[in-house]
UniProtKB/Swiss-Prot annotation:
Belongs to the RecX family. This is Regulatory protein RecX. PANTHER family: REGULATORY PROTEIN RECX FAMILY PROTEIN. It is found in: Cytoplasm.
Amino acid sequence: MSEPTSRRPAYARLLDRAVRILAVRDHSEQELRRKLSAPVMGKNGPEEIDATADDYERVIAWCHEHHYLDDERFVMRFIASRSRKGYGPARIRQELNQKGISRESTEKAMRECEIDWSEMAREQAIRKYGEPLPSNFSEKVKVQRFLLYRGYLMDDIQQIWRNFAD
């Protein structure tokens, strides 16, 4: 029978927790560190894991070694996921920045992904406002504001109306 959680070494408990977290979905290294340092809900309420900074570093290193934690893979999957939900490149970049991903990694992944952002912006506008897209000024402004909020760049948004005659 396994020993009670409270008697297991902090490193083993941290490693177990990291694997469970990463089994659900990919995380950035910063996200994993934040989740590992957060209190765990136990039978008697929140419990802290008395782990040293070295324990955290060993767990992160183990996750990298065993390919549980890979920021490149995380970035590519995150971009694909958020673009499927209709978000544009500016918003995706900002969210990756909040998750602790470097600007260089983000830009590299954005160049490698084969997403036509202007076509995505057009699809989002049609989904929200219907086809044909509005042509009067005040309605165009509403569409632009919506797409800017979703994270599309002004060039991609303006491309919708440039190709409007097609």
